[in-house]
Amino acid sequence: MLRWTRAWRLPREGLGPHGPSFARVPVAPSSSSGGRGGAEPRPLPLSYRLLDGEAALPAVVFLHGLFGSKTNFNSIAKILAQQTGRRVLTVDARNHGDSPHSPDMSYEIMSQDLQDLLPQLGLVPCVVVGHSMGGKTAMLLALQRPELVERLIAVDISPVESTGVSHFATYVAAMRAINIADELPRSRARKLADEQLSSVIQDMAVRQHLLTNLVEVDGRFVWRVNLDALTQHLDKILAFPQRQESYLGPTLFLLGGNSQFVHPSHHPEIMRLFPRAQMQTVPNAGHWIHADRPQDFIAAIRGFLV
């Protein structure tokens, strides 16, 4: 059975003053609470990729969804930086991608991670674009620290519980059940993992998304996403913290036309928390709008930046 591990990619060298900069961080010690009370969870130094641009323009920050990573937005970030001249930041959430693992996992602590990172990089106030889990993190960040968020884009997610439409618990269980022998070629290991996942997850696009987390470390294939933490805190990830304050900045809820994640019944809560919210639907797109309709996704962001 595969287990998660802390798998790191070596940092690339900088590409000059106008190229991307990369950050790779060591594993940071978690709080003594382990997410179960006691000391407060501490922020982690997140892994990120920053594309250079005009400092006078608000930067665009992309936050990925559950099981994702900053690489989900690589192509879109490059295009957006070229077309708008803005700095574009993509970030790995804790327990995802190249960011450190921690037993602490909640929207409050993921928001705190960003409250530490964004000012350090000199990127505030910024435009925050969050998909799914990243969208909930972005919404909470805007509610808690509105001075950090110039405007907000929540991609196919709303500030309510998501359990009715998601299959994330099934995905976690399927990933934990994968069994791959050591020392196999990468292509063979990926094929075997896909075959085992397919017995539970019929959607090939979802399987391919999950398999981006399969990495080889010392001849063993492991999940780089922290499945233990996700399993323990999945209920928190599918929920959204109760808040009384509102974010008064410009807000766009970008919805997939074929997705059921944002329901009309969510609109009152959306408008309570985000009174300036606009709704825009991308036709023929599912939950992963940026993957299904990348050009429409970019066009929607650019239209909202004007």
From Swiss-Prot:
Q: What is its EC number?
A: 3.1.1.116
The protein's UniProt keywords, in alphabetical order, are: Hydrolase, Mitochondrion, Transit peptide, Williams-Beuren syndrome
Q: How is it modified after translation?
A: Phosphorylated.
| Reactions this protein catalyses | 1-octadecanoyl-2-(5Z,8Z,11Z,14Z-eicosatetraenoyl)-sn-glycerol + H2O = 2-(5Z,8Z,11Z,14Z-eicosatetraenoyl)-glycerol + octadecanoate + H(+); a 1,2-diacyl-sn-glycerol + H2O = a 2-acylglycerol + a fatty acid + H(+); a 1,3-diacyl-sn-glycerol + H2O = a 1-acyl-sn-glycerol + a fatty acid + H(+); 1-octadecanoyl-2-(9Z-octadecenoyl)-sn-glycerol + H2O = 2-(9Z-octadecenoyl)-glycerol + octadecanoate + H(+)
Active-site residues, record numbering mapped to chain: 132 (charge relay system), 228 (charge relay system), 287 (charge relay system)
Q: Name one Pfam family in it.
A: Abhydrolase_1
Residues that bear N6-succinyllysine: 78
What is one term from the GO cellular component aspect held by the record? mitochondrion
Effect of mutating residue 287 to A? Loss of DLST lipoylation
One GO-annotated biological process of the protein = lipid metabolic process
Superkingdom, taxonomy of origin: Eukaryota
- Annotated region Disordered: where? 19-40
Cell location: Mitochondrion; Mitochondrion matrix
A GO MF annotation of the entry reads:
lipase activity
Q: Where is the composition biased (Low complexity)?
A: 23-33
Tissues showing expression: Ubiquitously expressed. Highly expressed in small intestine, prostate and thyroid, while aorta and colon tissues exhibit weak expression levels.
Protein family according to the UniProt entry: Belongs to the AB hydrolase superfamily.
Noted disease association is: ABHD11 is located in the Williams-Beuren syndrome (WBS) critical region. WBS results from a hemizygous deletion of several genes on chromosome 7q11.23, thought to arise as a consequence of unequal crossing over between highly homologous low-copy repeat sequences flanking the deleted region.
Outline what the protein does. Answer: Catalyzes the hydrolysis of diacylglycerol in vitro and may function as a key regulator in lipid metabolism, namely by regulating the intracellular levels of diacylglycerol. 1,2-diacyl-sn-glycerols are the preferred substrate over 1,3-diacyl-sn-glycerols. The enzyme hydrolyzes stearate in preference to palmitate from the sn-1 position of 1,2-diacyl-sn-glycerols. Maintains the functional lipoylation of the 2-oxoglutarate dehydrogenase complex (OGDHc) through its interaction with the OGDHc by preventing the formation of lipoyl adducts.
Protein name according to UniProt: sn-1-specific diacylglycerol lipase ABHD11
The scientific name of the source species is Homo sapiens
